[in-house]
């Protein structure tokens, strides 16, 4: 970024911001040497939020994030109702947004803990938790950004990322509700016998 003029910096920033939420393309190699920790945290936040509803990208979706921000704003203002663009948002929608966000956050943290606590690296290289978390969020959001960690994982580590990609694409709430319904149905079937 240092060798770019102001217009190129602005254009590149816009490109990277949009790309972090959708495609994962980059116009410069992502490494911790070229991006500050603050920059990585910003990219991770954008990746975690992800694409808009109806898009093919993963993440929690922009509509979920907007619902959470509106609920936060209403809470801070002491308002009972959550209103977005003159429309009342139901408590059910807010609870769903909270469920998606918390479930997704816990899932990504579980992925990162599995990668950091198990010996999943083929080479005995040391990676920071920030690098591991970046890779897990990128997989969950199906963005495709990589800082060099993925190629150094063994098959178990790569499997964790693959599962993360499926969960991120399908949605944590959909998978948890399907699992819950299957468990609940089998419990009811056993009680009927």
Predicted feature locations:
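Membrane-proximal intracellular helices of multi-pass ion channels
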Residues: 1-193
């Amino acid at each position: 970024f240092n060798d770019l003029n102001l217009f190129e910096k602005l254009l590149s920033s816009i490109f990277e911001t949009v790309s972090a939420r959708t495609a994962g393309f980059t116009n410069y190699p992502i490494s911790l040497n070229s991006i500050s920790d603050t920059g990585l945290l910003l990219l991770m936040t954008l990746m975690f939020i992800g694409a808009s509803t109806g898009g093919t990208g993963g993440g929690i979706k922009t509509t979920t994030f907007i619902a959470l921000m509106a609920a936060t704003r209403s809470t801070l203002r002491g308002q009972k109702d959550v209103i977005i663009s003159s429309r009342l948002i139901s408590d059910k929608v807010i609870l769903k947004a909270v469920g998606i966000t918390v479930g997704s956050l816990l899932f990504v943290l579980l992925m990162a803990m599995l990668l950091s606590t198990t010996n999943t690296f083929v080479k005995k290289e040391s990676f920071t938790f920030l690098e591991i978390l970046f890779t897990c969020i990128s997989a969950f959001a199906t963005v495709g950004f990589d800082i060099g960690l993925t190629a150094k994982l063994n098959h178990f580590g790569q499997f964790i990322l693959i599962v993360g990609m499926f969960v991120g694409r399908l949605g944590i709430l959909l998978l948890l509700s399907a699992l819950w319904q299957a468990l609940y149905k089998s419990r009811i079937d056993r009680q009927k016998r």
